[in-house]
From Swiss-Prot:
Keyword annotations: Acetylation, mRNA transport, Nuclear pore complex, Nucleus, Protein transport, Translocation, Transport
Gene that encodes the chain: RANBP1B
Region (Disordered) location: 1-32, 160-217
SMART domains recorded: RanBD
UniProt xrefs under PROSITE patterns: RANBD1
Residues forming coiled coils: none
Protein name: Ran-binding protein 1 homolog b
Bias-annotated ranges (Basic and acidic residues): 181-217
């Protein structure tokens, strides 16, 4: 009798196990509800070549508080544009990729070692990292003296190169202006001569008309 009374329980267990197995593996393929398309990520650096990149920590001088404030830790780069040849300094925070510094390195800019620390250096720049041009005083710190020297050397090379370009352009513009003035002077010298020749021709024509108008004897 005991064996008979246990049969329904066994059957119920078998049905539950079978149902559970069917729930676990139905063989159905579920398609995703939303399909995510690949989005091309642009950084604005696609048309530029990196000529130097170093890990560092950047600070800016807060004029109101008269103290240095950290801008972020990441990689500082010198980027050269393939078309214009202009070189800018860009630094992004390593974790968020937020821009800490973004400015051109131009003629007249200078960089110098920070007082009392040969791993740091400072410079002034018209920075655009916040979406508008601001006069900033930056200080950057590197892990080694060698990296700091490499940064300063490249900074100076770029600034000097831009200064030479400006001097060359000024010289070219001056030469072009002088050439234009010379041409104008030559043209002004020609005008009196041309005018005299025209007067002679006019006089000759008038004389001929006069001779033709005189009746013959």
């Amino acid at each position: 009798m005991a064996s008979i009374s246990n049969e329904p329980e066994r059957e119920n267990r078998d049905e539950e196990e079978t149902g559970a197995n069917e729930d676990e593996d139905t063989g159905a393929q579920v398609a995703p509800i939303v399909r995510l398309e690949e989005v091309a990520v642009t950084t604005g650096e696609e048309d530029e070549d990196t000529i130097l990149d170093l890990k560092s920590k950047l600070y800016r001088f807060d004029k109101d508080g008269s103290q240095w404030k950290e801008r972020g830790a990441g990689t500082v780069k010198f980027l050269k544009h393939r078309v214009s040849g202009k070189i800018r300094l860009v630094m992004r925070q390593s974790k968020t990729l937020k821009i800490c510094a973004n400015h051109l390195v131009g003629s007249g800019m200078s960089v110098q070692e920070h007082a009392g620390n040969d791993k740091s250096c400072v410079w002034h720049a018209r920075d655009f990292s916040d979406g508008e041009l601001k006069d900033e005083l930056f200080c950057i710190r590197f892990a080694s003296v060698e990296n700091c020297k490499a940064f300063m050397q490249k900074f100076k090379e770029v600034a000097e190169s831009e200064e030479e370009k400006e001097e060359s352009k000024d010289a070219s513009d001056t030469a072009g202006l002088l050439e234009k003035l010379t041409v104008e002077e030559k043209e002004s010298e020609k005008k009196p001569v041309e005018k005299a020749e025209e007067n002679k021709k006019s006089e000759a024509v008038e004389e001929k008309k006069t001779e033709e108008s005189v009746p013959s004897a």
